Design a protein with these regions (language model features):
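Active-site histidine-anchored catalytic micro-motif
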Residues: 6, 11-13, 75, 79-86, ...
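Glycine-rich phosphate/diphosphate-binding loops that line cofactor/substrate pockets in enzymes
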Residues: 1-2, 57-61, 65, 91-102, ...
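Internal, active-site/partner-interface "lid" segment
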Residues: 183-212
Length: 486
């Protein structure tokens, strides 16, 4: 008899420290597919669903596709929006019974009004519907909160290993293979997690943390170890499970899974200073930029990364560039629909007085008033992000005395140098380039940049986790406490 597999996707990354919610419109902007996501071009979030359909049909099994939707990282999701999406998935599962497996693509750091652990809530409700014999698998972003409820409710959890997230489809295939083996009785997965008592950020594209990722991969497929994941955690949420955790999936041996999760977690702890991303202050970054003569120097404005839920309109670095008269500089992409409207009305070539940024509250700083020339207007701009294209809406390039500023109408982080090229700015021609991104820009700029540095500005995604008011985590963590094990 053909196996029956239900596939769906629901997620966002919730920054609880920003002053705006995530409502229905946030999901509509990125797409809501009611059972037909695989009939459309894949997005970064629906790509796993495409993989699962292909793999299911390859085996001659029956696939039932449910809801797929994702919202860009932002504030807490409105309760009704989450519950409506969740219930659509649950109702679809009920209608599809009997099932042999359920595969869900989630983020792992989704928070809604009344739900600190949306993924745990969703998975536990799925388990209550399908019972103990149906295999449940979930793929998650490595910036997740790996909760006990998630582990208790699913058979297999597999996280991205790479940041930038270049391996979403690879991890989807890995998860499917383990779930297929589970359904056919070849393996009996068990999972264990380990709390590293750390909250930090890790850039897996470069050593030494890249070496840790290679080691994780080398352990899989041997000695009964099915999968190894590192949950970096998502720093900008006040939930009980915030922080870094290791996860090991083993074939029927919980003691082995727990031992390896602890071993890897302790290895991470021992190397915490080496593995965690190092940041410059704004002043330090400006000093480096002022002395840099073999550009472009690329500076990541980490705290205003829309990919971490920040608005994308902060002005702290822009002000510093102007005050220090550092240039030629390229800055962006800044989210400022109002400024775009003014630039559009003025037209290309116009010289106007413009108020830029600082519109989303204190996390964005004060607006900056500049005399600028509207150099270029571009409509419906997309930028590459791995195998998919990511939207920026309409864009304009505004030129002041020392700085060219790219603005957009659709909030998104800067993934690729092509975002600037869309408005006629070639990053290679500038002394310094400032990108509103934390790390996903890396692959799109490493071929252009002479050097890449990371800046800790004030803002909604400030990487200094000692400043954030965590109230729900029950155990201490580094770096707020030097030794949280004492």
């Amino acid at each position: 008899m053909s196996k029956r597999v239900y596939i769906a996707a629901l997620g966002t990354e919730t920054n609880q420290f920003v002053p705006f919610p995530t409502g229905l419109r946030g999901y509509q902007e990125h797409g809501i597919w009611h059972g037909d996501a695989t009939q459309h071009a894949p997005t970064n979030f629906t790509a796993p669903v495409h993989v699962w359909r292909k793999e299911t049909e390859k085996r001659g099994w029956t696939v039932i596709e449910g809801l797929s939707t994702f919202a860009a990282p932002s504030g807490t999701t409105v309760r009704k929006v989450y519950e409506d999406f969740r219930d659509e998935i649950l109702d679809g599962i009920k209608a599809a019974l009997p099932l042999d497996a359920v595969l869900i693509n989630v983020h792992g750091a989704m928070v809604a009004d009344g739900y600190d652990d949306c993924e745990g809530d969703l998975l536990s409700r799925i388990r209550a519907i399908v019972g103990p014999k149906v295999a449940i698998g979930a793929e998650f972003d490595l910036h997740c909160h790996l909760s006990a409820l998630m582990l208790d409710s699913a058979d297999v959890l597999v996280g991205y290993k790479e940041y930038p997230h270049t391996d979403t489809m690879e991890r989807a295939a890995e998860l499917f293979a383990i779930i297929a083996d589970t359904v056919e009785g070849r393996v009996k997965p068990v999972m264990a997690r380990y709390d590293c008592r750390m909250i930090a950020q890790y850039r897996t594209s470069v050593p030494p943390i890249s070496e840790f990722v290679v080691r994780m991969k080398s352990l899989e497929g041997k000695d009964g170890i099915l999968s190894v994941s590192l949950s970096h955690g998502f720093s900008f949420a006040d939930v009980e499970d915030v922080g870094t955790r290791t996860l090991v999936v083993a074939d029927g041996d919980m003691a082995k899974a727990q031992a390896l999760a602890e071993q890897l977690g302790k290895e991470l702890w021992d190397n915490r200073e080496r593995y965690a991303t190092k940041y410059l202050t704004v002043d330090e970054a400006m000093d480096r930029a002022a002395s840099h003569n073999q550009g472009p120097l690329v500076l990541a404005d980490r705290a205003d990364n829309p990919g971490s839920g920040a608005p994308g309109d902060s002005t702290f670095v822009l002000k510093a560039l102007i005050e220090r008269e550092i240039g030629p500089a390229l800055f962006g992409v800044m989210w400022d629909p109002m400024a775009f409207q003014i630039a559009e009305e003025a037209g290309e070539g116009a010289r106007i007085r413009m108020r830029l940024g600082g519109k989303s509250g204190t996390v964005s700083g004060d607006p900056v008033d500049l005399d600028v020339t509207v150099k270029k207007i571009a409509r419906n701009v997309f930028q590459p992000y791995g195998p998919v294209m990511s939207p920026l809406g309409d864009m304009a390039l505004l030129s002041s005395e020392h700085v060219d500023i790219a603005i957009c109408t659709r909030r998104n982080q800067t993934f690729h140098a092509d975002a600037f090229r869309a408005v006629g700015a070639e990053p290679a021609d500038y002394r310094v380039v400032i990108v509103k991104s934390a790390q996903h820009f890396y692959n799109g700029f490493v071929g252009v940049a002479k050097e890449i540095l990371y800046v800790a500005t004030p803002g909604a995604a400030d990487p200094d986790v000692t400043r954030w008011p965590y109230t729900k985590r029950k155990t201490p963590f580094w770096p707020k406490v030097a030794d949280p094990w004492k």
